Amino acid sequence: MGGGSIVPPLGLATNASYIPDRYDVMIVDENVKQAIYSDADLVAVTTNTITARRAYSLCKEFREKGIPIVLGGIHPSVMPEEAGRYADAVVIGNGENVWEELLGDFERGRLKKVYRPETFDLTQSAVPRRDLLKGRYFYDSLQTSRGCPFDCEFCSVTRLYGGEYKYKPLDRIRKELESLRTRNVLLVDDNILGVGKEAERRALKLFELLGEYGLHWIGQASINIADNSEALRLAQESGAKAFYIGFESLNEDFLRAANKRQNLKKGVSSYKDVIKKIHDHGIAVLASFIYGTDFDTRDSLLRLVDFISESTIDAASVKPLTPFPGTRLYERLKQEGRLFNDHYWLEDPYPLFTFNPKKLSLQELTEATLNFLDIYNPLNSTGYFMRSYQSTQSMRASFIAFLVNISDNRTYRKYIRRHEHTLARRFGIDQWRRQKHREVDIVIHQK
């Protein structure tokens, strides 16, 4: 926090658009600067699980100053009792249609402990208050739909949106497009194409609309987008430069257990073909993978390292499987008594691992983490750029992938260094192995 951010906090800007004009509203993005302790009458904080401990600390500081606190976001929505210990009011779910009631209660001095607004109608969505975003961002952000048609065990989107997949009308999206402050845009929709003929027709119309504004955009998609050549063509023509795609694993047993059915339908053997089809339309592939599952072995993780290195993926994000509260994965591991800490997000620092996989020792899991450091080596980022350009023939798409690699590089290494002493104590490691390149030289001695 206090460092920088690539995209602005769209949720805060969206909620601000529903606050009456009689209020002076300030948005503070802690990814850009620390919170300002001013003479605010009311403070609303949004948080996910990773930032929950910091959010609770903020709540304590504001409440000590006598300023009422409202907590919202995905973590308070799935852990309202916990969040309620730190806030005067907790908003569960979408916040757009809660502000009239909440502010009325605030003015009467009778804030409720919990607000559960009805499902918000996206056809009534307002244009986010981007004028309140004071940070400098490389990308603007835009949401055209909510929810995801899939229900993966490790994902909390279905819990938050109730399995619904809803769209904003195109005329509403047009108004938002006209309010953007840059042509570089991140579409934060969980799945830009969706599933089924209706969803696909809607996506094609969306791409045509985006094409009117000369954008360079990044979106999130499932591997099924590779089967729709028309969608890829229109996406390319509308300015798509990269897709985040959750490949997740090379192990189909894990994909089956996690209900990642969209990947199972095509099969792991299709991954390289999916990548090629997207590349053929000048779009980079920003792939995400998960490790530390109950189906992983030391050998399978080495194969994953080889696959990422040998495939034509433009950028790879490899993270340990984390059971976020609100997911079926969290509930299952908690019931099985396998979580190291049921409230691990309150630990300082935020833990690297939260449970022990069935087929990996903690020593092997740690070694795998170090192996993935090679993927994030700065020298490899340069190689990825050259490979990306050869695959996409798009300088901008390759540059975007390069920036993602550099950002992940910094984040991943900082994360590892933050945990070096904790890892040494927990896993009894005598010494981290040296990495191929000298700038990665972390040595830890057993205590």
Question: What is each stretch, according to the model?
Answer:
Residues 82, 196-197, 253-258, 291-299, ...:
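Flexible glycine/acidic-rich beta-alpha junction loops that bind and position SAM and/or redox cofactors
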Residues 82-101, 234-243, 303-318:
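Structural recognition of alpha->loop->beta junctions
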Residues 70-71, 91, 113-115, 218, ...:
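Structural detector of well-ordered beta-strand residues that form the stable sheet scaffold
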Residues 1-184:
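Acidic, low-complexity intrinsically disordered segments
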Residues 18-26, 213, 274-285, 311, ...:
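A structural motif corresponding to the C-terminal end of an alpha-helix
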Residues 21-27, 106, 338, 351-447:
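Radical SAM enzyme core and accessory elements
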Residues 126-286, 291-293, 299, 306:
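Radical SAM [4Fe-4S] cluster-binding motif and immediate context
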Residues 41-44, 49, 202-208, 296-313, ...:
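Short, electropositive alpha-helical surface patch
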